[in-house]
Amino acid sequence: MTWTSGQLQREKQARPGSGAVLAFPDDKDLRVYGPAESQSAVFGDVCPLLTSLLDGYNVCVMAYGQTGSGKSYTMLGRHSDDGPVLPLDPQSDLGIIPRVAEELFRLILENTSRSPKVEVSIVEVYNNDIFDLLAKDSIAAVSGVKREVVTAKDGRTEVALLASEAVGSASKLMELVHGGLQLRAKHPTLVHADSSRSHLIITVTLTTASCSDSTADQACSATLPREQTEAGRAGRSRRASQGALAPQLVPGNPAGHAEQVQARLQLVDSAGSECVGVSGVTGLALREMACISRSLAALAGVLGALLEHRGHAPYRNSRLTHLLQDCLGGDAKLLVILCISPSQRHLAQTLQGLGFGIRARQVQRGPARKKPPSSQTEGKRRPD
């Protein structure tokens, strides 16, 4: 794989003198990480999105790629039965999620004048069913309950009866994540001894008081250090941020309470694509692979529909795409991290992943928007 004249290229020589080239357009928002790149360097390109989250924008960070290519390592870090130890060593191999947790609460503690409230929910999409990894049974044990996707009155896609917990620190957030990971479906394959068989979606919901007057505006500008604010403005790999307009404020309620803004951060560790001839799966694992393949195909189909500006995007072809409808449809700033293998054996999956990245990068859905808190847009929900 080479980076030449602003283009990412991968060539396959079928026979001498022939070849297939897959290239990304010259794009300053595209970043390529080599094998020696640190987890801290990768997080450096994610960090500006936390500025957007604190400003009230929805954000989604998604790892995509074949099984065994490093998605879970990128999002979570090296596999361990123990949770991460905070505060983090900048040179540690912990991934994006624990780094997001620590940085988010560091930024919140710098200015608490906007009364921030943080809630966390964790689900997995397994065999095209959604399971709540924070739901508890009658004896308060976390059990992973099956849930359904619903659409709220304001049009937002949500999970009915989804358990969420308020958190006040990065350690508490990661404690919940670690507990949810213990329930995540896994199955060994010839490619990966600890292969995840589900899509993991961690949603961090941040509710803050809106900057509605000059005093609040000053507080908002003080939320981040100058260099962090400038980095947020110049953040890379922001498909939805181009041409973003200043979002409208959420009206206060009749009781005179302060205006509020609710923003969601979705951290997605997708299940990996795989070839049955390479992974060697049979039985239940084969069914899992088929469901994973269908959901990833549905994801590519939605991006294709958005890219071609079709009148209808098939979000409901998969629960994964239905659940991610808000961020895929242009309501969020979306960052996709493609994880690929350098092995010639996995060339077909590598080319497929790069093709997905090209499609995702070309989708333009207009400006991201702030969303009001659910308490101000509460309405009857209907199952889809």
UniProtKB/Swiss-Prot annotation:
One of its GO terms (biological process) is establishment of spindle orientation. Minus-end microtubule-dependent motor protein. Acts as a negative regulator of centrosome separation required to prevent premature centrosome separation during interphase. Required to maintain a centered nucleus to ensure that the spindle is stably oriented at the onset of mitosis. May also act as a negative regulator of amino acid starvation-induced autophagy. It is found in: Cytoplasm, Cytoskeleton, Microtubule organizing center, Centrosome. SUPFAM superfamilies: P-loop containing nucleoside triphosphate hydrolases. Residues 1-20, 217-256, 362-384 are annotated as: Disordered. One of its GO terms (cellular component) is centrosome. The gene is KIF25. InterPro entries: Kinesin-like_fam, Kinesin_motor_CS, Kinesin_motor_dom, Kinesin_motor_dom_sf, P-loop_NTPase. Belongs to the TRAFAC class myosin-kinesin ATPase superfamily. Kinesin family. Keywords: ATP-binding, Cytoplasm, Cytoskeleton, Microtubule, Motor protein, Nucleotide-binding. PANTHER family: KINESIN FAMILY MEMBER 25 (PTHR47972:SF63), KINESIN-LIKE PROTEIN KLP-3 (PTHR47972). Homotetramer. The keyword Nucleotide-binding applies. This is Kinesin-like protein KIF25. It comes from Homo sapiens. It comes from the Eukaryota. One of its GO terms (molecular function) is ATP binding. ATP binds at G65, Q66, T67, G68, S69, G70, K71, S72. Residues 7-363 form the Kinesin motor domain. Pfam families: Kinesin. PROSITE patterns: KINESIN_MOTOR_1, KINESIN_MOTOR_2.
